[in-house]
Amino acid sequence: MRHKSFKTNACPVARSLDTIGEWWSLLVVRDALGGIRRFSDFQKSLGLAKNVLSTRLKKLVECGIMEQVSASDGSAYREYALTQKGRELFPVIVALRQWGESHLFSRGEKRLQVLDKRTGKPFRVEVQNAKGEVLTADDLELVTVKN
């Protein structure tokens, strides 16, 4: 089923979902943030059909989230690396993970957890204002501005 394009929508969330909202795309970005770079490794991790993975990677490259690069081991293979634009999705992936940890697992159920390498402890993503104060949705106002 085709969906309406949000490429000209004034809402940044709608435009973002138009680019990365297909769920395989975010899982590819998640794996790339975890160090996966080769097509076969993405396929193994995600269990995706080659054509679906190929389509997702192509779209991520076209929109500048990933790029094809020479293999890091010097072989003839091509790898996929996150661009700066792609690396900036890190807090989005962490926030989705955090929400899932809080709401989608039963007590005592096993799950993967991401820890801060320096401290070995879990961490939280929070929205803060310029003073470092934590904000909630009730603290926000939506206005239209020109870019």
Language-model-derived ranges and their functions:
Residues 1-8:
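A detector for short, charged/polar N-terminal pre-domain segments
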Residues 11-52:
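N-terminal helix-turn-helix DNA-binding core of bacterial DNA-binding proteins
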Residues 16, 26, 63, 93-103:
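Alpha-helical linker/hinge and terminal dimerization helices associated
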Residues 21, 72-93:
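Basic, amphipathic "hinge/linker" alpha-helix immediately C-terminal to the N-terminal HTH DNA-binding motif
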Residues 34, 84-85, 117:
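Structured loop/turn residues at secondary-structure junctions
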Residues 39, 43-71, 75:
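Canonical helix-turn-helix DNA-binding module
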Residues 94, 98-147:
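C-terminal regulatory/oligomerization modules of transcriptional regulators
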